[in-house]
Swiss-Prot record:
GO cellular component, one term: myosin complex
Biased amino acid composition, Pro residues: 37-55
Coiled-coil spans in chain: 69-160, 263-398, 426-517
Biased composition (Basic and acidic residues): 135-158, 165-187
Alphabetical list of Pfam families matching this protein: Myosin_tail_1
Protein name, entry field: Coiled-coil domain-containing protein 102A
Positions of region (Disordered): 1-61, 135-195, 207-248, 472-496, 509-549
Amino acid sequence: MSHGPSPRLAESPQLSKSSLLTILGSPSPERMGPADSLPPTPPSGTPSPGPPPSLPLTAPALLADGDWESREELRLRELEEARARALQMEKTMRWWSDCTANWREKWSKVRAERNRAREEVRQLRQRLDTLTKELAGARRERQEAQGECEARGRELARLRGVHSAADKTHDGPEPEREQEPVRDIGAERPPGSQELDLVESLLKSRPEEPEGCWDACSVAAGGPRVSSGRQDRNRLPWEDTASTEEDASKLTALRLRLDESQKVLLKEREDKLALSKNIEKLEGELSQWKIKYEELSKTKQEMLKQLSILKETHQDELGRMSEDLEDELGARSSMDRKMAELRGEMERLQAENAAEWGRRERLETEKLGLERENKKLRAQVGDLEEALARRRRQNASALDCDLRASQAALFEKNKELADLKHVHGKLKKQFQEKVAELAHANRRVEQHETEVKKLRLRVEELKKELAQAEDELDEAHNQARKLQRSLDEQTEQSENLQVQLEHLQSRLRRQQQNAPLFGKIRSTRFGTEEAGDGASDLDEDEDLQIQVA
């Protein structure tokens, strides 16, 4: 509404100037005279053109000054509002750039975590491959050790069969009864210990019956040489001593070989036990690693799904944000263009204002000159009263013409004012539309802020889930360590029990070895009366062996 009177006030000096020119522009003093003589003739009803023009000159000037000041204040206020909007747009753009930078940092962190997880999975796969290779090698070594043990067992069984055949041919039925429990125990003992017991029994029985031992050795060597060996011993006693020494040396060599084979078998048994334990341990670790690998693969798939979903949502958000930024940039460019137009219009209005002020000063100078001329004309009023009376009709017609001209000019000015009001209404509508667009943009910005907050909350939830998964993985590692420690303790306990069992077996073996000697000594000393006691001792030994077994 403040823009409405501005065109009329801007053009009011021109109207006063045209009216003054129409009234005072005539060079003949006869036309100017009747205008000054109008005040003393009120019955005529015509307006006086003399002093009244001073009032329409001063009042429109004051109105124009106030209107221009209000318009300038309004334009300055609009300019400040436009600057504030531009600053707000810059702040929003800066905020969006910070948001995008934060999202890039977060995505880089997530990408680094994903690469780290991939590297851990790759390392676990490599370790699994190495463990499978080691397990395969351990299995091959175990099979080779089993084959070697079977070969050594067959060889020892063959030697045991040879010595048992020699004992059967030499000792007869009584030694068979004495060595019968030894054979029963030998079925439960390793072949090396059985062979060692056979050799010791041969050595112990040799001082009592050297000829029988010689016969057994000769029978083991070959049948045709037995008769010839006996004839030679009967013929040559010194050859008997030489053969016994040679036989003793052979027995010692055989005993050494048996000791070495027993040591080798014990060592191989220990290696076999260690390999079996290592294989079981590796199989347990392999199963654990397989379970962990499956869990990691599942977690990896879940994380990949979540990452793909987040990536899609982020791409959608980036697309929407880019579209919004393009819209904001377009609105900002339009606002800049509008600001430039407003600035140009303001400069133009300032130039027009300066021109109007110059025109006003010129009109004031002209007003002062006209006042002086009016004073001169008032002096000539008395002289021109008669001429004015004669030309009153002519002046009345001239005044009617001037009135019509002024009315036509006023109609044109009113028409221009209506056009300016229409233009002002259009500009006001455009301004309201821009304000509505700005409000819509602000609502869009608030929606984006809420979406960004939701995404931040989702990222925090994902971080918490990742921390929970890491805690569960640590708990699984701790449980695996606890199980490993318990397994180590059980293996130590089993080794201790194995050592105790070996001690008990060795004691039982010594008791069994000493039992026949004690029986012989007691039979020679006390006779046949205490034979029942020896049998009871043997029964007690057998019961002890059964309990240990």
